[in-house]
């Protein structure tokens, strides 16, 4: 299983993910080791996550409370607009890069799952959360 999109690989675009210390360690391990995506950590708060995410060509951030989004730098947006194909363009249009939006984020998840021909069970079984120590 790989996150690598052939077009992103072709364009040498490296996405990055930003989490806080509240993220489940299993997700961090899966993202780093299985998907090969670098993970950065920030203090809690969207302002910290967003500031770090914009330092990646494609930055993904989310907090355990559900806040988050995907951001694209200008060069990546231009590359996707001109050479990315209809699917990547459509995904970029769905995303609210400014503040995130739970509805558009879920629509994005649905689009990715449909493209991979996955159901929710397959998605949920990608990795197992580490148990809460409290």
Language-model region placement:
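Phosphate-binding and adjacent anionic-ligand microenvironments
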Residues: 1-134
